[in-house]
């Protein structure tokens, strides 16, 4: 099993979309990239923690590659808007790929380069080493499935 951690706006919609991909065996929403190893939704919404809302995926690379996950990532959000997705604005809604190793970093950079030619605006998606990931509160997990 491998892990991918991706920021692409409010985590509720992307979580359900990623959960339907063949090869994704588990999803979890959380916060990543911030100043501390623990935080809350309320704190993240202040914009002072520097965390992004993210979806963490456990996936089987024999069924789906990290590259295919990233291509899907670019299909389901607008990577050309800075710190916003749809009606949501703030640094917690930024487009960001959090890599776990050099191989994921290289793949991320290549996919961004390839995807840049598909969009009319420049992709603003950041790539960063995973830092201070923590799961979101239970009520956020599988939020849209519970409704």
Q: What annotation goes with each model-predicted range?
A:
Residues 1-147:
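Flexible coil/turn and secondary-structure edge motifs
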């Amino acid at each position: 099993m491998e892990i991918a951690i991706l920021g692409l706006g409010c985590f509720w919609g992307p979580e359900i979309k990623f959960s339907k991909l063949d090869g994704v065996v588990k999803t979890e929403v959380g916060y990543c990239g911030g100043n501390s190893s623990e935080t809350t939704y309320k704190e993240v919404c202040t914009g002072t923690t520097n965390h992004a809302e993210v979806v963490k995926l456990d996936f089987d690379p024999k069924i789906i590659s990290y590259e295919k996950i990233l291509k899907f990532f670019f299909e389901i959000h607008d990577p050309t808007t800075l710190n916003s997705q749809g009606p949501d604005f703030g640094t917690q809604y930024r487009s960001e790929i959090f890599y776990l190793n050099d191989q994921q970093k290289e793949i991320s950079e290549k996919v961004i380069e390839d995807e840049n030619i598909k969009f009319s605006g420049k992709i603003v998606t950041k790539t960063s080493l995973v830092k201070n990931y923590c799961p979101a509160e239970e009520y956020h997990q599988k939020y849209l499935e519970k409704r």
